[in-house]
Amino acid sequence: MAHAPQIKIPATYIRGGTSKGVFFRLQDLPERAQVPGPARDALLLRVIGSPDPYAKQIDGMGGATSSTSKTVILSQSAKPDHDVDYLFGQVAIDKAFVDWSGNCGNLSAAVGSFAISSGLVEPSRIPRNGVATVRIWQVNIGKTIIAHVPITEGEVQETGDFELDGVTFPAAEVQLEFLDPAADEGEGGGAMFPTGNLVDDLEVPGVGTFKATLINAGIPTIFVNATDIGYAGTELQDAINGDAQALTRFEAIRAHGAVRMGLIEHVDQAAGRQHTPKVAFVAPPSTYTASSGKAVEAADIDLLVRALSMGKLHHAMMGTAAVAIGTAAAIPGTLVNLAAGGGERSAVRFGHPSGTLRVGAQASQVDGEWTVTKAIMSRSARVLMEGWVRVPGDSF
């Protein structure tokens, strides 16, 4: 029996924030994969090495965690006043499934630099030295992201002294602005607060009823108080990810929260929407030891946040969830805001398993409705490898 030979596709492997993924230009994909559909999904699954019953992604580029099982497709933007269209695919590890329902905030930090380096940004918009402003249209959620990319001698400056908890080595700082991050009316769960409330009573059969802030900003997120579900907010990955019953409870919270947010109609549909919504728990500041062994002092943070992604506690914090945290913290009365001490806030520094992160948001109330014009945070990005990725020619 003859076997199809491997084909090679231009690709770049990039770390963005505390995640990494395989980046493609749309024009470089095989023709069948240049349009959404089964062929594209099958190709990306094979590139990453999924589905893998061993959950290791040994036969692909994935790293067997939600932070490293990611793909990005970029193209010159068809949107006026934008430079690049950015499409993100979260690849399941043990299932044949690519989730297109949300963005990756961490990889957003790498979009601007990749767009510049791969010729997707007009040369006239790139200074010889200074900072390039890349206008990104995030296709998954229909929102604008502005990336401020440092440039030296006409090239992207990746090295620097900006340190990011969850990333071992320093790099150049990339500031990101997430414009109008809240959901638009009628889109995926409605407005910023889909239920119309800052805090709801969320009933989860078999788990309990507890207070929850259901917010759609950056990414749909369900925030609950750590103490209401038996946690302190200082937990590291092993405390959650090694507890199968805990993960089942969190998935139940996520599924019932998704129904309340209007993202799905029935809880059993949550399995087909793994990337969104996220579920997170918050607590007031407390001293703890991060996964690196570094002490995080209560006096250095405004609150504690732990968040789950793709069914596991995240090793640091998803960038889009950080947008949700910053947005919710800026609005008095949400659980996030109350955990941070309440009142009006333009920025918070929160503690996560790997350390701390500062995120800001500009919020205002108009006719009784809260709006957020932008959320701001800094990340870094670095190309790890570039060239081609190879897959069997009959795999998609």
Task: Tell where the protein language model's regions lie, with residue ranges.
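A glycine-rich beta-to-alpha transition motif near the start of alpha/beta enzyme domains, typified by
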Residues: M1-F396
